[in-house]
Amino acid sequence: MVFLPLSAQADLSDMSRIFRQTPSLSAFEVCYGGGCAEVKSLALTSDDWQKVADIFANSDINSVNPQQERQLIAKGIAQLETIIGEKIGTSNDLAGTFFEGHLSGQLDCNDEAINTTTYMRLMRQAGFIKWHEIEDTRTRNFFFNGWPHSTAVIRDSKSSTRFAVDSWFYDNGAPPVIVPFKEWKAGYRPADTPIDRPKNASKQTQTH
């Protein structure tokens, strides 16, 4: 089940291809515009990646437990969103989808779920993620304004507990929420999400 609130031109084949890619620092693709309506191929420089590595280097990776690792994953995703947003013009991506679909550089939950999965795969390839497996995206039948909602998912390798990793609830560059998947599936929504803010509260006001 796929929802396409931002653009009617989303390409399901692109969504599948990008989700199934084997990303590397020298070549990977990201989505935006709603359901991968826009796709960018890019690479990360050594300076870019060092910003992510520094997040994990500031902790003793050998003593990190699954809970601590989830906190680091969230910080790593936030850093990658910031870096990539500057490269492809999504720095002004706002939380949610409902009020900002007319603005440039916006992501729906499908874009967020796919990109977040890609970012976590890059971190796992680098050896930063040791306590979790990266799973397929999931969709829940809890509707926001008539639309289903998707998320990236990880699984704790020790306990087998699944966690939703949801970047959609906050603006670009903010850490995603990471909550038990069962809680997310039941309709979890963080109390501090700005997704219901009025249009005049957006940090980007010019339409394109």
Locate the predicted segments by residue.
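Anionic, Ser/Thr-rich low-complexity intrinsically disordered regions
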Residues: 14-17
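Acidic/histidine-rich, surface-exposed loop or edge segments in extracytoplasmic proteins
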Residues: 31-67, 90-102
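Mid-length scaffold segments of soluble, non-membrane domains
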Residues: 70-132
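Hydrophobic/aromatic-rich core segments of domains that either
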Residues: 121-182
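His-Asp-centered catalytic microenvironments across diverse enzyme cores
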Residues: 163-208
